[in-house]
């Protein structure tokens, strides 16, 4: 995959940098692996906004991704295609298993059409294969990591992300997360070897506001541009906040820790990300 730059024939093209989609081998998704996706506009079941700046965007259909893979242990799968997924930054790979079933997985870096992938404790250590952490050597880069055995991958699923296995102690493996946090994860949890593909996603530049709207993101209005009724920063003469920066609900921002004090998972965190 590469990046595509444009001549500044219009203001919107001047700084635009997008993917050239050269890694995509199939343009139409697999119908049996699609599901309808209803837009929420950032609202919950009460109709209240729970995530601001969401709404609109191009219509999408959800691609059903296999984040588990352990139920296909020992069954080889051939990579049929690398596809675009509008619901995530990573590409997805269409697999055809030897038993005839087709499934989508996150497309790892270095996996191409025609490759054969495996999952299970006896799988080879190579990009795209899924194994329990106890079977993966220390130092290996992995993605799509489970937090709870059997739940499916939850960590390192975005384009270009990975975790690194730093050590193994008893029933736990010590993983360095994409954030830099060191965390213990049970060795029975599955992970996929390698790095998530489409690494250049972080270098893309939308170039114009309209392209961001196509993605379903609405304008982010500054608090100082609002009225006092709408935001703690609102009102006043000029652009001053008048006090320490806060969120729209009055909580301090810019460095204020919002993580709940005592959580059951605290005992698995060896080093916080801000201490890395």
UniProtKB/Swiss-Prot annotation:
InterPro entries attached to this UniProt entry: NA-bd_OB-fold, Rib_uL2_dom2, Ribosomal_uL2, Ribosomal_uL2_bac/org-type, Ribosomal_uL2_C, Ribosomal_uL2_CS, Ribosomal_uL2_dom3, Ribosomal_uL2_RNA-bd_dom
GO cellular component: large ribosomal subunit
Keyword field: Ribonucleoprotein, Ribosomal protein, RNA-binding, rRNA-binding
GO biological process, one term: cytoplasmic translation
Residue ranges with Basic and acidic residues bias: 230-240, 263-276
Entry's transmembrane regions: none
Residue ranges, annotated region (Disordered): 223-276
Gene3D superfamilies: 2.30.30.30, Nucleic acid-binding proteins, Ribosomal protein L2, domain 3
A GO molecular-function descriptor: transferase activity
Role, per record: One of the primary rRNA binding proteins. Required for association of the 30S and 50S subunits to form the 70S ribosome, for tRNA binding and peptide bond formation. It has been suggested to have peptidyltransferase activity; this is somewhat controversial. Makes several contacts with the 16S rRNA in the 70S ribosome.
Cross-referenced HAMAP family: Ribosomal_uL2_B
Subunit annotation: Part of the 50S ribosomal subunit. Forms a bridge to the 30S subunit in the 70S ribosome.
PANTHER family: LARGE RIBOSOMAL SUBUNIT PROTEIN UL2M, RIBOSOMAL PROTEIN L2
Family according to the record: Belongs to the universal ribosomal protein uL2 family.
This protein's name: Large ribosomal subunit protein uL2
Organism: Thermotoga petrophila (strain ATCC BAA-488 / DSM 13995 / JCM 10881 / RKU-1)
Gene encoding the protein: rplB
């Amino acid at each position: 995959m590469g990046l595509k730059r444009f001549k500044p024939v219009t203001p919107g093209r001047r700084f635009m940098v997008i993917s050239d989609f050269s890694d995509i081998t199939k343009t139409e998704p697999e119908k049996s692996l699609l599901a309808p996706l209803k837009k929420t506009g950032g609202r919950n079941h009460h109709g209240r906004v729970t995530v601001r700046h969401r709404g609109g965007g191009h219509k999408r259909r959800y691609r059903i991704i296999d984040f588990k893979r352990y139920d296909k242990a020992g069954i080889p799968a051939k990579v049929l295609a690398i596809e675009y997924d509008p619901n995530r930054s990573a590409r997805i790979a269409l697999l055809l298993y030897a038993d005839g079933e087709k499934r989508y997985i996150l497309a790892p870096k270095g996996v191409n059409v025609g490759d054969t992938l495996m999952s299970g404790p006896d799988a080879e250590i190579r990009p795209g294969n899924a194994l329990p952490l106890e079977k993966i050597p220390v130092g290996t880069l992995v993605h799509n990591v489970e937090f709870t055995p059997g739940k499916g991958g939850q960590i390192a699923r975005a384009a270009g992300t990975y975790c690194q296995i730093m050590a193994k102690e008893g029933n736990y493996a010590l993983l360095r997360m994409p954030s830099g946090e060191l965390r213990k994860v049970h060795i029975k949890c599955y992970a996929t070897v390698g790095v998530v593909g489409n690494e250049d996603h972080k270098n893309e530049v939308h170039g114009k506001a309209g392209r961001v709207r196509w993605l379903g993101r609405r304008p982010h209005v500054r608090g100082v541009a609002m009225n006092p009724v709408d935001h703690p920063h609102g009102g006043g003469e000029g652009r001053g906040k008048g006090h320490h920066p806060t969120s729209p609900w009055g909580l301090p921002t810019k460095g204020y820790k919002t993580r709940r004090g005592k959580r059951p998972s605290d005992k698995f965190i060896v080093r916080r990300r801000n201490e890395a």
